[in-house]
Amino acid sequence: MSASPDSPLLVAIEQNTAVLTLNRPDKGNSLTPQLLLALEAAWHHIDNDSNIRVAIITGAGERHFCTGAAVGDLEMGKGGLQNQPYAAANRFSPRMCHVGKPVICVVNGLTNGGGLHFVADSDIVVGCERADLMDTHVSVGQVSALESAGLVRRAGVGAALLLALCGRGYRMSAKRAFDLGIFDLLEPTAADALTRARDLAAAISANSPQAMALSKRAIWAATEFTDPGAAVHGWELLKSHWAHPDFEEGPKAFAEKRTPKWNPDPNARR
């Protein structure tokens, strides 16, 4: 995967890690149709490339991570998003694209509106001290129904309502976002946050790809099921892994004091 320096999405492969950078810094890294298509293609490539174990997404520049939709560039009327179902119209975040691999979001600056999708839909979120959050939908007469619903999983109803109902009248600090659990880790600067994400990615890359994929599915499912339902679903995922070579390779490598040789094929059987 590659992209020109002028592309709205920069893609770099660093060993087993794909680094995606929203590249419209002069426009707040806002989302355009071209960028949305590039994101969808990138997520699908990441999920289907066995050499990629983990992905990082961040924004270019020093001020913004992502300020949401570039409204003037998005067709909302007849023949556009208005006539599309949710799954067809929303295919740009890792969760929307059903990415089975771990995704780390590095929030390097202000995030508003649609940019919150990446925060809500990533597996691990690393913020920096200037990474404030806003949701200005209602201030411009729009409904906050998607990003805010995703934030409920991370921070609860109160935090999501505070952002959604106050609109541009409330700006959540990065420290507050960390305290609420929206950010999993908080670093002083954007550079520090990206370095931390790369360190996490290196650790993640050493693990069994299939075990991580099933663990991720089980944990995300717990946000959608009742407690008994989540346990039953998790049990079935756990049992399905027993037939995979990594189930045997992990303990064997540990006993032999060597680095495991993981099998990236989810359909492999021992």
Residue ranges and their predicted role:
Residues 24-25, 49, 207, 244, ...:
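Short loop-to-helix capping motifs
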Residues 1-58, 62, 270:
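Conserved CoA-thioester-binding segment of acyl-CoA-metabolizing enzymes
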Residues 36-38, 44-48, 71-112, 145-155, ...:
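An acidic, glycine-rich surface segment that forms the CoA-thioester-binding/catalytic face
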Residues 62-66, 112, 134, 219:
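Short, active-site-adjacent cap segments at secondary-structure transitions
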Residues 97-209, 258:
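Crotonase-fold acyl-CoA enzyme core
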Residues 1-23, 164, 169-205, 213-224, ...:
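Amphipathic alpha-helical segments at domain termini/boundaries
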